[in-house]
Amino acid sequence: MTSVPLLSMNLPRHVAIIMDGNGRWAQARDLPRIEGHRRGVTTVRTVTEMASELKLDALTLYCLSSENWKRPQAELDFLMHLLQQYLVEERRTIRDQNMRLRFIGRRDRLSDEVLKEIAKTQAVSENNTGTELVLAVDYGGRDELTRMTRQLAQQVRDGERSIDEITESLVDESLDTAGLPDVDLMIRTGGDIRISNYLLWQISYAELYFTPKCWPEFERDDFQAALDEFAGRQRRFGGLNVGA
């Protein structure tokens, strides 16, 4: 297994991952789709451990999109059970690895049981100072921007602020990800080359990395390869390279 060079790399502060390909991985092995999701939890453990070792500021994982509610109810029920199980089983690890848990997305469609486990894990990790582990559950970029717009519009209507106060900084502070650095590197597994309504505001200047590997087979070396690719890219943010 390749060791992780902690000091020799230009590391991203914030990595966001679209964990795609669980179902395809399972179907290719004549397994039920839910077995792909179950195996995917092992990969979650792998990348969170590595993010903690590297002392990344934040790791955001796309667990359930706001569009995923269109899936069969049995699969959705299993995903919710898997999330609960993960939070219970990994609570101590998250705490001991000095990680902080954060949840982004809607809460009104999640069960009380899921919300309770999220709250418990947030509580035991809230004073930690290491990597922030952000779980995007019932999350969609358009939904987030719509909720933020309504919130600011309500504040203007109620006289709490003026239109002139609405700036990029205020928008940033009003999103689910308030206080987090913008995404530097977005990784998508599973072979599809699209962003799927994920962190639309936050990935404005992110480097995008797509791999054909499905999420259950994404390993430490694969994460390292994405980080190596990021380290070799020139990030211009609309400007020019020095000497260009």
UniProtKB/Swiss-Prot annotation:
Cofactor stoichiometry and binding remark: Binds 2 magnesium ions per subunit.
Group of enzyme by EC: transferase
Cofactor: Mg(2+)
SUPFAM superfamilies, per the entry: Undecaprenyl diphosphate synthase
GO molecular function annotation: magnesium ion binding; prenyltransferase activity
Pfam families (UniProt xref): Prenyltransf (PF01255)
Binding site for substrate: 21-25, 33, 37, 65-67, 69, 71, 188, 194-196
Binding-site list for Mg(2+): D20, E207
Subunit structure: Homodimer.
Family: Belongs to the UPP synthase family.
Function of the molecule: Catalyzes the condensation of isopentenyl diphosphate (IPP) with allylic pyrophosphates generating different type of terpenoids.
Protein name: Isoprenyl transferase
